[in-house]
Amino acid sequence: MGGFAIALGLAPQQLLQHINKPPSQLRLIHYPYNLNAEDTQGIGAHTDYECFTLLLPTAPGLEVMNGKGEWIDVPFKEGALIVNIGDMLEIWSNGEFVATSHRVRKVKEERYSFPLFFACDYHTVVEPLPELVARHGQARYSALKAGDHLYAQTIQTFRYLRERLARGEIKLPDGAREVGSLGQHGKNKGLSNEEANR
């Protein structure tokens, strides 16, 4: 996190102060061998909800959206880590970092992925940093609580939770952002900040 702060021209502690007991997750994702896979979609387009993701893939298949709204392959290199910017860094940076819109294409070979979803502390208020607001003349994003954002995005992503939401068994936190409202995907959908915030 300190490195991201330095890249923004800030002191490392401006972001590091929010990393004390983060609810980060390291996951193992398995994509089984699929003889019939031929450039079909595996995991749909999304951004990661946290600050950033470190990813160690074992085969090709990851695609990212570039600034023109085109899907491009991420070149696979054995043992190389991929860093995806997440929603929270986009907001903190006031858009200087853009959350990585990405998806996974089904490939014939068996594939494993080891993502570390790196979050900030659950109760952190994430909003554009004052220095970056001054640089751009205005805040491009409204504030959100990190834990509320993780919860809201999870509810809106998984079908069984969307069904519970529709039945009124659970509810979204106030100010929940729509899934896909950040990153290049959100920009290319034409969502304004006001539209993206409910």
Model-identified regions with their sequence ranges:
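C-terminal flanking tails of non-heme Fe-dependent oxygenases
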Residues: 1-198
